């Protein structure tokens, strides 16, 4: 799955209410985000103590991880 496909399948989901940000870095407690930085894709998580954790990789890998996280947050 590519980023544009992720945007399409999540267009009817209130991502902000789930604590998900697509296309820009997360900056609130308990949020997760996915964005491109140069040639790299980044998944960034902010925990309850405002610590930031990043995973970097290929677009498909990062998008797959964030989509899985979105599905878990919906439950």
Task: Specify the residue positions occupied by each region the protein language model found.
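Short intrinsically disordered terminal tails
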Residues: 1, 74-75
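Negatively charged, low-complexity tracts enriched in Asp/Glu with abundant Ser/Thr
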Residues: 1-27
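Local beta-strand/beta-hairpin segments that build beta-sheet-rich folds
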Residues: 22, 50-54
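Short aromatic-glycine-(Arg/Gly/Cys) micro-motifs in beta-strand/loop hairpins
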Residues: 27-51
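A short, charged, amphipathic alpha-helix used as a generic interaction element across diverse proteins
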Residues: 55-73
């Amino acid at each position: 799955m590519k980023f544009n496909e992720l945007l399409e399948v999540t267009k009817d989901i209130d991502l902000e209410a789930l604590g998900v940000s697509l296309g820009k870095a997360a900056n609130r407690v308990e949020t997760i985000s996915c964005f491109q930085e140069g040639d790299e894709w980044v998944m960034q998580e902010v925990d309850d103590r405002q610590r930031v954790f990043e995973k970097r990789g290929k677009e498909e890998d990062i998008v797959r991880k964030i989509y899985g996280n979105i599905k878990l947050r919906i439950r």
